[in-house]
């Protein structure tokens, strides 16, 4: 590489001088080494000895005067660049000349690059400044260098800064947003407060209205409870619905519930229930004394009922639930005091289990454990005024699980049908009133008296005595049938006047006294004590219900058979099939008819039919059936008034049949509709109602 500078000749001369000096120094070194005993290059190859760092004047390449960047490791320890060493080894060195560039390349490849790089790095770090002038061109390069011209500064361009918002604008906007949010929250809070206030005012107003309504209801309940309080005393599951419980404005077709019972009748029912609630374990003396104390006012109150006040409770009374009246009713003693307003206000609550929709399943299940037929534990007794008070017998039927007639129908009926149902109801009431109770205690002998009572007879003597009294009353009615034919045309309507009742009562009393005297002379089958009791019973007053029963029996007899046979001894006793059928329902018990006055035969009309009860014990006692003479049935009525009444009663019978047929039709339709979907009242205890017999 040629040196760059102003004088090329001077540089070449300097380079030649340097090479010569180096060659001489190299030879001197070899000689010194030979003297020391080291093997020469001629005899053996010399070992490569790395010298120390070169001096500053020797740090450059003799060929190009540059710092060797890539030093070639020569055997003579000369420092040369790789380019100079490859072209020609130092000409002044004997070791370098024969080897030449080929050896240098092999040496550099074999010795590795580590030592060469170490030496080059040492040279660059050791003396960089003295080598720079020679590298740049020798002495000429060491002169002052021209300073570089400064770069021109770029021209300043002013640009207007972009303003996103004015100072304080964002904070003002945030403040507005916070203010709006606060106003909205305050408005919602005010709305909520207003709503709560309105709700509170509405609730207070509702409470005030409820209190006012409650006060008005309490006044109404107080007024109604004073009139019908005894009718609300029943909450038993199977207790018979009283007339007070049936007061509703809706008048159904088959179960009419309009009722207007008097307070006296309800009080009598209450006292009667209190009597029934006595325990069966009480002694006979205690029961007789208690009934003697309570029965007279009750009997007097019961007899005040007129046909006009008798309500139409319903035709299907057998479907209503009945409670066993012989079981003690413990709720009556608890509810007797009605002094406080709270007890009166509690009366308007609905009954617990009267409705079939009741959810009281416990009381419904208790019906399975109640007896089907219950007999009272108290025997019939004689009242101080001479009347005989007999207990009731409760007869009920098993359940019918396939249908239910408890619910009332929702359709109306015509006034004509309602009138016919009223007549049917009256007939049922008559039959229940005249039914005889079955005694459960031991019957004493004839003439034996219970302590605390006048005279109580056995159950076998009582039916005969009761029948004689009823028969005498029927005779009186048959005698006065002619004069009162115009008054009886409207019978059995509810609008019967009290004048007719008074007339019937007077006639029945007079004839009862006559019957008493005749029974004292002609009675053959009864003892002296029995005759005295018959006389006392015949002289006692009869209630209006029994009188109406006899009248209905007489008129129905005239209508069906158009015969009015008269008996010479009894003075015109009606003895037709209809009369005997009704009297048989009076429950003579042993299947015979006994006449206490003249022992006249009364037709039985049971020829060829099965007897309802056995009469073997009666035949053993000497009592036999008596058949009527055929001559009594050949008489024909001659009174046109009675014939007219008979025709009317026959028409009423046809209307009753029509009402029953319509009821069956409606009932069949209702069962058809409810057959697919079951009803909740399919398991009800169906029993006959005894509302009219109380």
Curated annotation (Swiss-Prot):
One of its GO terms (biological process) is double-strand break repair via homologous recombination. A motif (LR motif) lies at residues 675-687. Probable E3 ubiquitin-protein ligase that acts as a regulator of double-strand breaks (DSBs) repair following DNA damage. Functions in a non-canonical fashion to harness RNF168-mediated protein recruitment to DSB-containing chromatin, thereby contributing to regulation of DSB repair pathway utilization. Its EC number is 2.3.2.27. The modification Phosphoserine is found at residues 12, 234, 236, 326, 390, 396, 472, 630, 679. This is E3 ubiquitin-protein ligase RNF169. It comes from the Eukaryota. The MIU motif (motif interacting with ubiquitin) mediates the interaction with both 'Lys-48'- and 'Lys-63'-linked ubiquitin chains. The UMI motif also mediates interaction with ubiquitin. The specificity for different types of ubiquitin is mediated by juxtaposition of ubiquitin-binding motifs (MIU and UMI motifs) with LR motifs (LRMs). It catalyses: S-ubiquitinyl-[E2 ubiquitin-conjugating enzyme]-L-cysteine + [acceptor protein]-L-lysine = [E2 ubiquitin-conjugating enzyme]-L-cysteine + N(6)-ubiquitinyl-[acceptor protein]-L-lysine. Keywords: Chromosome, DNA damage, DNA repair, Isopeptide bond, Metal-binding, Nucleus, Phosphoprotein, Transferase, Ubl conjugation, Ubl conjugation pathway, Zinc, Zinc-finger. Residues 119-137 have a biased composition (Basic and acidic residues). Interacts with DYRK1B. There is a cross-link at residues 273, 349, 498 (Glycyl lysine isopeptide (Lys-Gly) (interchain with G-Cter in SUMO2)). The gene is Rnf169.
């Amino acid at each position: 590489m040629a040196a760059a500078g102003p004088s090329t000749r001077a540089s070449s001369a300097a380079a030649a001088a340097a090479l010569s000096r180096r060659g001489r120094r190299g030879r001197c070194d070899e000689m010194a080494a030979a003297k020391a005993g080291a093997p020469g290059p001629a005899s053996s190859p010399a070992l490569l000895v790395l010298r120390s760092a070169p001096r500053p004047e020797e740090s450059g390449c003799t060929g190009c005067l540059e710092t060797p960047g890539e030093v070639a490791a020569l055997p003579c320890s000369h420092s040369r660049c790789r380019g100079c060493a490859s072209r020609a080894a130092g000409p002044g060195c004997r070791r370098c000349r024969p080897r030449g560039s080929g050896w240098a390349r092999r040496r550099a490849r074999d010795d590795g690059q580590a030592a060469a790089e170490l030496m080059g790095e040492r040279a660059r770090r050791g003396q960089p400044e003295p080598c720079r002038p020679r590298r740049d061109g020798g002495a000429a390069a060491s002169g002052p260098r021209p300073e570089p011209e400064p770069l021109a500064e770029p021209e300043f361009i002013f640009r207007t800064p972009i303003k996103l918002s004015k100072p304080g604008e964002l904070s003002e906007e945030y403040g507005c947003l916070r203010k709006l949010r606060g106003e909205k929250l305050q408005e919602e809070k005010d709305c909520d407060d207003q709503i709560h206030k309105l709700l509170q005012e509405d609730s207070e107003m509702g409470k005030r209205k409820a209190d006012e309504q409650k006060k008005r209801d309490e006044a109404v309940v107080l007024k109604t409870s004073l009139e019908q309080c005894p009718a609300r005393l029943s909450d038993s599951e199977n207790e018979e619905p009283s007339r007070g419980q049936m007061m509703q404005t809706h008048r159904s077709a088959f179960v009419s519930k309009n009722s207007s019972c008097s307070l006296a009748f309800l009080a009598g029912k209450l006292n009667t229930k209190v009597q029934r609630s006595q325990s069966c374990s009480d002694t006979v003396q205690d029961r007789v004394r208690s009934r003697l104390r309570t029965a007279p006012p009750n009997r007097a109150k019961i007899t005040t009922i007129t046909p006009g006040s008798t309500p139409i409770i319903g035709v299907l009374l057998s479907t209503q639930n009945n409670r066993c009246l012989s079981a003690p009713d413990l709720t009556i003693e608890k509810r007797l005091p009605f002094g406080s307003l709270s007890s009166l206000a509690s009366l308007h609550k609905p009954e617990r289990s009267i409705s079939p929709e009741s959810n009281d399943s416990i009381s419904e299940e208790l019906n399975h454990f109640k007896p089907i037929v219950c007999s009272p534990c108290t025997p019939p007794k004689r009242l101080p005024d001479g009347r005989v008070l007999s207990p009731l017998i409760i007869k009920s039927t098993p359940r019918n699980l396939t249908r239910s007639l408890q619910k009332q129908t929702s359709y109306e009926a015509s006034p004509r049908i309602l009138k016919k149902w009223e007549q049917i109801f009256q007939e049922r009431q008559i039959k229940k009133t005249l039914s005889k109770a079955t005694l459960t205690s031991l019957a004493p002998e004839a003439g034996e008296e219970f302590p605390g009572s006048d005279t109580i007879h056995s159950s076998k003597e009582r039916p005969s005595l009761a029948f004689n009294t009823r028969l005498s009353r029927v005779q009186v009615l048959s005698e006065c049938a002619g004069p009162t034919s115009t008054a009886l045309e409207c019978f059995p309507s509810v609008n019967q006047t009290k004048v007719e009742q008074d007339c019937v009562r007077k006639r029945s009393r007079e004839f009862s006294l006559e019957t008493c005297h005749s029974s004292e002379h002609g009675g053959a089958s009864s003892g002296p004590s029995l005759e005295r009791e018959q006389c006392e019973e015949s002289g006692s007053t009869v209630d209006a219900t029994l009188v109406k029963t006899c009248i209905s029996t007489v008129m129905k007899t005239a209508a069906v058979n158009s015969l009015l046979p008269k008996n010479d001894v009894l003075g015109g006793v009606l003895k037709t099939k209809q009369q005997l059928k009704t009297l048989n329902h009076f429950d003579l018990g042993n299947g015979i008819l006994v006449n206490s006055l003249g022992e006249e035969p009364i037709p039985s009309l049971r020829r060829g039919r099965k007897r309802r009860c056995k009469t073997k014990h009666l035949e053993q006692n000497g009592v036999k059936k008596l058949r009527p003479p055929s001559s009594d049935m050949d008489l024909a009525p001659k009174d046109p008034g009675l014939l007219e009444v008979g025709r009317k009663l026959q028409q009423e019978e046809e209307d009753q049949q029509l009402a029953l047929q319509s009821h069956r039709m409606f009932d069949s339709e209702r069962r058809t509709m409810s057959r697919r979907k079951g009803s909740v009242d399919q398991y009800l205890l169906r029993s006959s109602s005894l509302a009219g017999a109380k």
